Every structure is written in C-alpha cells, then in structure tokens.
Amino acid sequence: FLPDAMVNYLLRLGWSHGDEEIISREDAIAWFGLDRVGKAPARFDMDKLADINSHYLRAMDDGELWALVAPLVTPTSPNAEERVTKLMPLLKERAKTHKHIAAAAGFLVHDGAPEIREDAAGLLDENAVTNLHKLLGDLPEGPWEAETLQTFLKDWLAENGLKMKDIGLPLRAALTGTKQSPSIVDVMAALGPEEAADRIRKTCKI
C-alpha cells in the first residue's frame, strides 16, 4: 500500500472531518483536533484501505508508479517502460494496489509470444487462427494510435463479413495471453505494429 494511503486510512480510524474520506497529510495537519477523535473502538477494514489506496494510485504520476511496478515484473524488453506508462491510465483504473498493476502489465514487459493462460487457450481455435492470419496480412503500417486502429478494425470486420466477437478475444489472447486486458486497440497501440504482428505470428504459428 502507498504510504499516503496508509496514513489517510489510519487517520480516519479514530478521527473524522465531516464526510471527508480522502485527506492529504497537509489537510490532516490543518484540520486535526482532539474534539473530533472518536470514542468507539476502531475496526481495521482491508477493503476500505484498498479503496483508499486505489484513489492514491489513480492520482499518482505514471512515471513514478512505473518505478514501483518495475521491480515486481523484472522487465526484459527495452520498450517495457514506454509500453506500461502508455497503458498506465487504463491499468490503474481498476487496480487496488501497484501489485495488481504489475500482474496486469506482465504481457507488456517482455517481447515475443506471451504465455497463453489455460482459460485463454481455447480462444485460439482453428477458425480464430484463420481470422488472425487474415488480419495479420492487412494490418496498417505504424505509428499506431488507438483511435485509428478502432476505425481500421471496424472497416476490416465489415469487409470480411465478421463481427468483433470473431476477432476480439482471439486477438487479445494472441497479444496478451489472457482473456482480460485494457481495450484491444489500446493494447495494440502500446505494443506497436512490429511487436503485435510478431506475437500473432508466433502465437498462431503462422
């Protein structure tokens, strides 16, 4: 847990300032008074602490947050920091701690085909591989941005008589090894055209 989040939570265990839940150290110093110290015994609530921690995570600078995440993921790609910080605003949306971010960012910090998790392996059946092979041959040149990729995929699906369900989850599995990740176009933009194409080729053995 982040130090400021822990201080905030411990402070609120026995003291309050109206309905304020998020209290910075500066505000705590300015507002603190013994008249608002509670008499009832406090109960340590890990879920509440995690909620407060998530607030501080979202407010934290992405570069500073990467410095906390990096030791937990042992990156091997020279592009790891760039990829993770590019997706950091999305990665920290649902994270409660920086360990959650590290777990979600694992596919970004190494190059090459990701390790496919057991629950995602079934997404890469013969039909999915055929569709990914088609997509691979039509991928636009870089640089990639999420907005332009969204338009490309929409048009590509229409041209090939497919729906997003036919390509979305298989593509996510090929690029991340998982069934869950930030938006697939954001993932593609973070990886870039060369790395994304390489992962599709290696994962699908094309």
What is the predicted role of each segment?
Residues 38-42, 56-60, 123-125, 140-144, ...:
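A short, ordered amphipathic alpha-helix with a cationic face
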Residues 5, 48, 65, 83-87, ...:
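Residue-level detector of well-ordered alpha-helical segments, enriched
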Residues 143-206:
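Charged substrate- and nucleic-acid-binding regions of tRNA-handling and nucleotidyl-transfer enzymes
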Residues 1-56, 151, 170-175, 179, ...:
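Alpha-helical recognition segments enriched in aromatics with Gly/Pro capping
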Residues 21, 42, 62, 81-84, ...:
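Alpha-helix N-cap/helix-initiation sites
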Residues 62-160:
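Small-residue-rich helix-loop
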